UniProtKB/Swiss-Prot annotation:
Gene that specifies this protein: psbB
HAMAP family membership: PSII_PsbB_CP47
Phylogenetic classification of the source organism: Eukaryota, Viridiplantae, Streptophyta, Embryophyta, Tracheophyta
Cofactor: record remark: Binds multiple chlorophylls. PSII binds additional chlorophylls, carotenoids and specific lipids.
Keywords for the protein's UniProt record, in alphabetical order: Chlorophyll, Chromophore, Membrane, Photosynthesis, Photosystem II, Plastid, Transmembrane, Transmembrane helix
Name listed for the protein in its UniProt record: Photosystem II CP47 reaction center protein
Quaternary assembly: PSII is composed of 1 copy each of membrane proteins PsbA, PsbB, PsbC, PsbD, PsbE, PsbF, PsbH, PsbI, PsbJ, PsbK, PsbL, PsbM, PsbT, PsbX, PsbY, PsbZ, Psb30/Ycf12, at least 3 peripheral proteins of the oxygen-evolving complex and a large number of cofactors. It forms dimeric complexes.
Listed SUPFAM superfamilies: Photosystem II antenna protein-like
């Protein structure tokens, strides 16, 4: 036919059998990728330390999505929360991956069958004998079926009525687990961080989809609307489908980047805003203050801070610190976290407690400044070797550790104090193993960052695709010179021009 690469899809423009075939093949590719990617991730995933080396630090992308839907165990005998599992059952990580690959194979065979047997009776209008698809009716069928699936997911899977429930975390990502969810029907259900809204919204949206599907199956569109919106043209379907996809992609990019009940930090890592707002730091200080109010020592209170909570309060886990095009997992960047050294408390020679000003998200370097409780600068580490009235040496800064591996240890040596002040810029201080993975020390983003970037980028591209195909279908006769009422199967590389009966036509 001599079609350019960007026009090859016109071969299925008015060939319903092969249009169906290529869509089944697309489903096969998507399911096959998901299953294969899951098996690859399971082959490289190390489940031994769910606190300091969780899935998101290891760059896992599909495992978190399986986990949030209720899959927590592996046929390898491990569970996502640590420990061993004796009876993981059919729906383990490997079971889900295998089901996707098997489904992919069946779709592959179905696609081949429909490509070979494309000329089916069902695709012909019995009144005219010409190939025809009743697109409004097909829309109704799809809307009804997707409504059933949506309702079923919300009413059965999420609620635990027939299914495991979904992953639910506390606000600080410490005690998350899979559990059934009760639908939330009040205004609080619209809070993106309330899991009950997931159940209620799927039930409501599914009900609406079922009713809308039945409506479109039983009511025909008016002729003017049918012609005005080009409801008989398959490119109208393409345009509106792209609109649905780009809208969904924009929404999930937002829920992933800003955080929501659907994207728990235990599975996808913390958001950048939790670092920007000192979210975990505030909770840590709240717990410490509560302990001190009960007459516990600093050492006791800091020792009770969960290592998991302290690890969230480290800038290396901020998804905005990794460059978009730095390949690899977070572990390939700053290394594998081995242990929390403890919380450093700095004091000057007058006994004032000093706080290291933390590095903002979008800085690669930042001056090391120590301020007192009133925010007054008391010490710093100058960029140049220079005399400074605020220097660590002149101010006599010391550091003492509470909690963690260095609990009770203090240092007054200026070089050591500066080293820990520099590290305290980055939040809580952790020992990091860079040797195992040959980590380069340059921060990487988490799957939260990749997912957001990918979906926002494709949403933008698909937005332009929607405009393009929408314009083409609305103004097809103007743009292409193709008769909008053309229903013969023609070879679209040799165009049938509007008003030109001499243009070569070839029946399919």
């Amino acid at each position: 036919m001599g079609l350019p690469w960007y026009r090859v899809h016109t071969v299925v423009l008015n060939d319903p059998g092969r249009l169906l075939s290529v869509h089944i093949m697309h489903t096969a590719l998507v399911a096959g990728w998901a299953g294969s990617m899951a098996l690859y991730e399971l082959a490289v995933f190390d489940p031994s330390d769910p606190v300091l080396d969780p899935m998101w630090r290891q760059g896992m992308f599909v495992i978190p999505f399986m986990t949030r839907l209720g899959i927590t165990n592996s046929w390898g005998g491990w569970g996502i929360a640590g420990g061993t599992v004796t009876n993981p059952g059919l729906w383990s990580y490997e079971g889900v991956a295998g089901a996707h690959i098997a489904f992919s194979g069946l779709c592959f065979l179905a696609a081949i069958w429909h490509w070979v047997y494309w000329d089916l009776e069902v695709f012909y209008d019995e009144r005219t004998g010409k190939p025809s698809l009743d697109l409004p009716k097909i829309f109704g069928i799809h809307l009804f079926l997707s409504g059933v699936a949506c309702f079923g997911f919300g009413a059965f899977h999420v609620t635990g009525l027939y299914g495991p429930g979904i992953w639910v975390s506390d606000p600080y990502g410490l005690t998350g687990k899979v559990q059934p969810i009760k639908p939330t029907w009040g205004a609080e259900g619209f809070d993106p961080f309330v899991p009950g809204g997931i159940a209620s919204h799927h039930i409501a949206a599914g009900t609406l989809g079922i009713l809308a599907g039945l409506f479109h199956l039983s009511v025909r569109p008016p002729q003017r609307l049918y012609k005005g919106l080009r409801m008989g043209n398959i490119e109208t379907v393409l345009s509106s489908s792209i609109a649905a996809v780009f809208f969904a992609a924009f929404v999930v990019a937002g829920t992933m980047w800003y955080g929501s009940a659907t994207t728990p930090i235990e599975l996808f890592g913390p958001t950048r805003y939790q670092w920007d707002q000192g979210y975990f730091q505030q909770e840590i200080y709240r717990r410490v203050s509560a302990g001190l109010a009960e007459n516990q020592s600093l050492s006791e209170t800091w020792s009770k801070i969960p290592e998991k909570l302290a690890f969230y309060d480290y800038i290396g886990n901020n998804p905005a610190k990794g460059g978009l095009f730095r390949a690899g997992s977070m572990d390939n960047g700053d290394g594998i976290a081995v242990g929390w050294l403890g919380h450093p408390i700095f004091r000057d020679n007058e006994g004032r407690e000093l706080f290291v000003r933390r590095m903002p998200t979008f800085f690669e370097t930042f001056p090391i400044i120590l301020v007192d409780g009133d925010g007054i600068v008391r010490a710093d580490v100058p960029f140049r070797r220079a005399e400074s009235k605020y220097s660590v040496e002149q101010v006599g800064v010391t550091v003492a550790f509470y909690g963690g591996e260095l609990n009770g240890v203090s240092y007054s040596d200026p070089a050591t104090v500066k080293k820990y002040a520099r590290r305290a810029q980055l939040g809580e201080i952790f020992e990091l193993d860079r040797a195992t993975l040959k980590s380069d020390g340059v921060f990487r983003s988490s799957p939260r960052g990749w997912f957001t970037f990918g979906h926002a980028s494709f949403a933008l591209l698909f937005f332009f695709g929607h405009i393009w195909h929408g314009a083409r279908t609305l103004f097809r006769d103007v743009f292409a010179g193709i008769d909008p009422d053309l229903d013969a199967q023609v070879e679209f590389g040799a165009f049938q021009k509007l008003g030109d009966p001499t243009t070569r036509r070839q029946g399919a």
